[in-house]
């Protein structure tokens, strides 16, 4: 999101900007790197901090907080060797900055032509984020979360039922152990997990299902769905403090969730002259 925010701001002020922005985030630190050719000036620190705040990293206990994290920039000018292959006298003859393989994929499983399992996983996380921002229920939620949906298909490639739903969501340490013993800690962790699992099934999923208006998709939900909620048992440490993040490291969830094919090039932080992005969109 930070890489795309930098790109958006540069294109807003200079539509001819050539941008390849990468972002690395880890405990208390953001590093921006890449190559840019533009006539615009943008405040990289402000852009990064606004995105981090919008996502929800606003507390020091997360070990990654919008106001206090360091933001370093190692962005430099685009290579003239690359630029000479991109910019031409006739804009209609614009070249590509690189070669590669790009793929498109579409399915009639959903109204947006995306694979059903990916669409449902995205819906789950979008509703989970809405619940967290509303702050009325599941008030222990923290910003980091992941989801995966496994669907059973028949021999004709038609979805017949949802088999498994995985929801991993970061949370506060909202139940404290009675003492310092390992037994007490395990008991507190089990109580937290039970509460989160109950809320996922009784609060989150009904809201997700309520937003689905396709009768064929609704028919896939059943009482036999296996729910894996925070399978490790605890998810207090998360975000960039728990897992270092890097632009382009999750290319499958950014595309078709394992369906179709992928040429390996990420999308975020790249202007349309980068065919990794524009050609994949065109396909």
Model-based region annotation:
Residues 1-20:
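N-terminal, positively charged regions that mediate nucleic acid binding
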Residues 249-251, 256-283:
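C-terminal catalytic subdomain
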Residues 38-52:
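Active-site-surrounding "flap" and adjacent substrate/cofactor-binding loops of secreted or lumenal enzymes
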Residues 35-42, 232-248:
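Short glycine/threonine-rich loop-to-helix capping motif typified by GTGT followed
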Residues 19-39:
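Short, charge-patterned binding micro-sites
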Residues 41, 113, 117, 189, ...:
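Alpha-helix N-cap/helix-initiation motif
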Residues 3-7, 121-125, 201, 279-283:
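Short, hydrophobic/amphipathic alpha-helical packing segments
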Residues 28, 46, 53-237:
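Glycine-rich, mobile lid/loop segments that gate access to catalytic sites or pores
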């Amino acid at each position: 999101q930070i890489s795309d925010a930098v790109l958006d701001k540069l294109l807003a002020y200079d539509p001819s900007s050539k941008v390849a922005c990468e972002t690395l985030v880890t405990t208390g630190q953001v590093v921006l790197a890449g190559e840019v050719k533009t006539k615009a000036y943008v405040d990289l620190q402000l852009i990064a901090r606004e995105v981090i705040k919008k996502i929800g990293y606003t507390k020091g206990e997360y070990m990654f907080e919008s106001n206090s994290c360091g933001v370093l920039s190692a962005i430099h000018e685009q290579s003239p060797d690359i630029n000479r292959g991109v910019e031409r006298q006739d804009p209609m003859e614009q070249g590509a900055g690189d070669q590669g393989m790009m793929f498109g994929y579409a399915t009639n499983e959903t109204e947006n032509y995306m694979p059903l399992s990916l669409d449902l996983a995205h819906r789950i996380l979008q509703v989970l984020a809405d619940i967290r921002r509303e702050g009325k229920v599941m008030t222990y939620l923290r910003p980091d979360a992941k989801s995966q949906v496994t669907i059973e298909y028949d021999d004709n490639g038609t979805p017949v039922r949802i088999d498994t739903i995985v929801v991993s969501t970061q949370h506060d340490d909202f139940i404290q152990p009675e003492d310092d013993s390992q037994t007490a800690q395990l008991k507190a962790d089990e109580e937290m997990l039970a509460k989160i699992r109950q809320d996922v099934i009784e609060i989150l999923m009904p809201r997700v299902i309520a937003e689905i208006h396709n009768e064929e998709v609704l028919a896939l939900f059943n009482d036999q769905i296996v729910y894996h909620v925070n399978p490790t048992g605890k998810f207090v440490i998360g975000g960039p403090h728990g897992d270092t993040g890097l632009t382009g490291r999750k290319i499958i969830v950014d595309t078709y969730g394992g369906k179709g094919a992928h040429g390996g090039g990420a999308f975020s932080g790249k202007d349309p002259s980068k065919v990794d992005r524009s050609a994949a969109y065109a396909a």
